[in-house]
Amino acid sequence: AQLGSMSAASWVGRGVLIEGDPKVAFGDATQPLDGEEKPSDSFSFLLSGDAETVTVTLTDDEGNAYTAQLKDVKSGVKTYTLDDLENFQPEPGPPQDREYTLSFEAKNPEGDNPEISGLIQEQVSGVTMTANGAVLHLLNHDPITMGDVVVIQK
């Protein structure tokens, strides 16, 4: 999709979802360091097909991992909050005073497992036009191409 320079300029300031490992925190658990954004308790992923279960793994900076499941998830871009996760293993679940990196696994009983990719939200801070098309410069991420964008937000 070739975008003209005028339409590319309209991307500046917009939020985009791109593939990556989302970070989350429970409620008011963590205070961000100066200049850093506070992690949200919501997360998104892209699912290529319907899944009976999506296993969400929360891993803290020390490598401690906790898993929970989402049931009967339809294909597409999905957004949940940590409150949607139940039955954490191991019990009693993750301490709520730290940040976690998420990873995902989708499964079906027939073994026909859809692809699943974590999504991270970034903000477009600038656009460069190159011979290969527009390059989006993001606030907290390396530059990406238009093709790397999964969802455009307002």
What does each model-identified segment do?
Residues 1-154:
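Type III/flagellar secretion export determinants
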